[in-house]
Amino acid sequence: HDRGCRGRGPVVIKLTFCLRRLPHLSREAFQRYWREQHAPLVAKHAETLGILRYVQCHTGHDALNGTMQGSRGGPEAYDGVAELWFESEEAMAANTSEAAVKAGAELLEDEKKFIDLANSPLWFGDEHDVVSRG
């Protein structure tokens, strides 16, 4: 397998979380909370949860997105995508310490404040680099 995380050595598993905001939030308010409140919380718990890397991709570029969606007949874009890299599935399964459970619960409670969880799919998968320039 050619799994990897640029510059971080081999990584076996990646979590991708496609986020939709709660209906009462504007995209700007959602992204600000996600960046300024939730991101530091993830950083605080990263070591406890075994998170090697955490990236937020905030939706923007509305004209480009509209063109792409129109040409494909696709659904409305997500408000953002979170990507989290972990050492392995086994390491995640073994991470059942009281501190890890508490950290995960704290993150979930915070997510309920700004993410429409019922409409925000997430999954674990493996990366396969096809093009990696720069």
Set out the residue ranges of the language-model regions.
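Macromolecular interaction modules
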Residues: 11-134
